[in-house]
Amino acid sequence: MHHHIKALLQSALNIKNTIDIVLERPKNKDLGHFATPLALSLAKIEKTNPKLIAEEIAKILTNYAEFEKVETLNGFVNLTLSTTFLQHIAQKQLQHCMTLEADSINPNISQYTQKTQITPKEHILIEFVSANPTGPLHIGHARGAVYGDALTRVGRFLGYDILTEYYINDAGAQIYMLGLSIFLAGREHILKTQVEYPQSYYKGEYIIDLAKQCALHFGEDVFKSEDSISSLADFGKDMMLQEIKDNLAQVGIKFDSFVSEKSLYDRWQDTLDTLKSHQGIYTKDGKIWIASSQINDEKDRVVVRENGEPTYLAGDIIYHQDKFHRHFEHYINIWGADHHGYIARVKAAIHFLGYDENKLEVLLSQMVSLLKGGQPYKMSKRAGNFILMKDVIEDIGADALRFIFLSKKPDTHLEFDVDELKKEDGSNPIYYINYANARIHTLFNKAGVNMQQTAQNANKLDINEQAKALLFEALCLQQIIESSFRNREIQKICDYLKSLSASFHSFYNTHKILQSPNESSILYVLMIVSQSLTLGLSLLGIKAKTRM
């Protein structure tokens, strides 16, 4: 709809491609569906009175069937779309992105993408979660996980070629510490030997569980010698990675690729040589440093210690060299907010590797504060000082978790009470949206609607003004989707779904629908509303409910 109107304005008014045509939604709905400040922009270029230009634009556009009314106000041109045009857009939307069966509406996202993709879009690599395989996923990981997955779903819907990737941090001190923690837990709980734990060891019942699994796999003698720590670390890492994959599957997340840090380390010398060839590293005090302060970092960083061991940063440098060597057009990393200071040093490394660091976009995900009945959510005994993603899914369900985590910008702090998401009223957004869709399908069932037949006869229907307003709102989803991906603001889809649901509930409560003179036209409009609710939820990774 937005693209059609913009293209019409450009063609009808002979506007150059260099001029941006803006369509705004007026706060006062009486002013029309859209307002454009195009006359103000043209007036600056032509040094002319914007009111005169606006009047000339209105005079031209009045002749087009897309508009029921065209008016001017303070240099703006206000556009009220015709019912015929809205019905035309609705028909296209039904055909492109939904499969209509006699009694149901199903998303057909791949078909939509094929039909609407005009030009090839970017090949993008999105890396997210990438939690160390040293423990279970907590709710901080969960927020970045559902955000990365939803961003991928929306991007693919719009025709972007996206590959999702999980970087496995399976090298370095944290993996050794996992093995040591399992070893000591085995000695204490299986061999019943008194042990002294280091300050930075991994805590929680999951470590004891891993020790018991290691005893079954290797035998109890594995805890008698420190020589087994490496084997215990590898076994524990593999077990935790599988648990992470299982946890992600619970919320519908599956990665296209997993890349092991350990598998990349045989390239470290080649990576150092490349950095050196671009004057990116130097030796000082027995260490090798990357000159990241030259590329917007606050200081240079150590990449190799005095003992010859690479630092944590070295692993990320090798990984990003591997990423950029695969020649994607754009790279998106979704990191925890505590990694904010890491962005500049990684971008500096990309620069010194000979790649364009501006192709890397880093999005940050803030932590989550959870309440239950107004009190802090109980920490997991299994994980120690964390709230596990798995526990919250069991408490409120995957759909509620996905929606609430996507309902705010990821770089803002999120606090919510899980008990609110169990309520069956308007205070629970996912219930409110699903209830709207279920109400619509109840109407379809009572009326015995054949959706295919209703869609085919749409042009014969007489839609009144109230239903037309609801139809217009239901047709705004495409623009919301495009904006949400362009600005990386998936919460816009959540806001739209809540708003559309509220508009439907208001319409439902104030209008007689079944056995009314306008029954057929209203049910057709509600078909479009249901389509938008179903598709919007699908892009968030949530299956819309048709009965509750």
UniProtKB/Swiss-Prot annotation:
Keywords: Aminoacyl-tRNA synthetase, ATP-binding, Cytoplasm, Ligase, Nucleotide-binding, Protein biosynthesis. It is an enzyme of class 6 (ligase). Its main location: cytoplasm. GO terms for molecular function: arginine-tRNA ligase activity; ATP binding. One of its GO terms (biological process) is arginyl-tRNA aminoacylation. Disulfide bonds: none annotated. InterPro entries: aa-tRNA-synth_I_CS, Arg-tRNA-ligase, Arg-tRNA-synth_N, Arg-tRNA-synth_N_sf, ArgRS_core, DALR_anticod-bd, Rossmann-like_a/b/a_fold, tRNAsynth_Ia_anticodon-bd. It holds the Pfam family DALR_1. GO terms for cellular component: cytoplasm. This is Arginine--tRNA ligase. It comes from Helicobacter hepaticus (strain ATCC 51449 / 3B1).
